[in-house]
Amino acid sequence: MKVIDQDLLEKVIIERSRTSHKGDYGRLLLLGGTYPYGGAIIMAALAAVKSGAGLVTVGTDRENIPALHNHLPEAMAFSLQDQQLLKEQLEKEEVVLLGPGLRDNAFGEDIVKQVFASLSQNQILIVDGGAL
């Protein structure tokens, strides 16, 4: 376990170059927000962007995407039901947050299994909420 203290924060939170772009600050994939828990994934995505994550992509129920874009137009989003797109996203992300608002049912269990089977050792997985 890592302790978050002042020294760590000073190393992580740095002034950004005026010529940089969001792609310079990592790629984060958030997976969750299945019915009726869409708000959880939207709040997680907002927190990710506000805390400095670079390219943020959200996999959620299709019905949540308009609300997500209303709060966070810069986020990319796709339907979790699109298994091919989920597979492609899992291959290219650096960090995956799995679980905010993920319903505890067969579909949620399938998503968890797919994520665990797909990630490589150099990717970071954070498990939260319904994925626990």
Give the predicted meaning of each segment.
Residues L132:
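Active-site ligand-binding patch in enzyme domains
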